[in-house]
Structure formats: C-alpha cells, structure tokens
A protein has these predicted regions:
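Intrinsically disordered, low-complexity regulatory regions enriched in Ser/Pro/Gly/Thr
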Residues: 47-49, 104-108, 124
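Short nucleic-acid-contacting surface segments enriched for D/E, G, S/T with interspersed K/R
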Residues: 95-114
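OB-fold ssDNA-binding interfaces and closely related basic DNA-contact patches used
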Residues: 1-82
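OB-fold and OB-like beta-barrel modules that bind single-stranded nucleic acids
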Residues: 29-35, 109-117
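A short, sequence-level motif marking secondary-structure junctions
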Residues: 36, 74-75, 91-98
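Short, basic/aromatic beta-hairpin or loop at an interaction surface
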Residues: 78-92
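OB-fold/S1-family single-stranded nucleic acid-binding modules
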Residues: 115-145
Length: 145
C-alpha cells in the first residue's frame, strides 16, 4: 500500500520543459545527455511523433541564416550562433541521429560529439548526414583537440 504525501505533491515543481532543438547541418559541438530517449506522441501542431532526449550543449557553434526584405529585395543575413551550457530537448528527427543515438545507450551523463556533414544523396536516397561519436572516441580520431 502506498501513502501519498499530498502536501509535497502540490509543492513539487517538475523540471521545466526545455526548448526543442534540431541541430543544423553545419552544427559542430559536444552535448551531454541529461536523460534517456523518450517518445512524444503527435499533437495538433506536430507533423508526426518524435523521439527526443534532454541535453546540455556543453559547447557548440552553428551558422544561422535570417531572410529579410529590404527595399523590395529579399536578403539573407548570416551569423554564427555559439552555444555554451544551454539545456535543450534534442529532437531525433534526422534519421542519422535517430539511428546513432540508441547505439550509445545508456545515454544519461554521456558526452557526445555531433558534427553536421551536409546533405547526402544518391540514386535512391537523400538524407542529412552527421558524425555522432562519444566524446572520447572523437578525441581518439582527432576530431577534438
């Protein structure tokens, strides 16, 4: 039999929801997993179900492009976004991430190197490519100095 502490239950503050993050094809950085992969079922505004994992971006950099209109012409502004100790919910929407991350389980506390390698395509396939390695393995092969 369980005894529930209703006072503590009403005072309990669950961890706040983190902003979703889908790394771009030029993202390079190291993340630390704060938990394991979990499944989020499709809701009204979502295209499909998605697998996610809460992470802390220890260090990373990504190019951001912003399109705007100036004097009737469309222009693009490019800037570098740097990440440091930011907590996000990593979406495993990209097939390479969805395939690679479970092979690194258990994830909690694990540091993972991610680097976008651009779009890959061939006769019968098209996908976004990423390098996904444990931080220690990335150091061994010289991807991190």
């Amino acid at each position: 039999m369980y005894n529930f502490d209703m006072e503590k239950i009403t005072q309990f503050e669950p961890r706040p929801a983190l902003k979703f993050w889908n790394p771009g094809l030029d993202f390079v950085g190291v993340i630390q997993c704060l938990g394991e992969i979990r499944h989020i079922t499709k809701t009204v505004n979502m295209k499909s179900d998605v697998d996610v994992v809460d992470v802390r971006i220890l260090q990373g950099i990504e190019t951001m492009e912003e399109t705007y209109e100036e004097m009737g012409r469309e222009k693009t502004k490019t800037s570098q976004k740097e990440y440091a100790s930011e907590e996000r919910t990593l979406t495993l929407a990209k097939s390479v991430l969805r395939t690679a991350m479970p092979h690194l389980a258990p994830l909690t506390g694990k540091k993972i190197f991610i680097a976008g390698k651009g779009k890959k395509s061939g006769r019968n396939f098209k996908y976004d490519d990423y390098i996904v390695l444990e931080e220690s393995d990335a150091r061994k092969v010289g991807l991190i100095r």
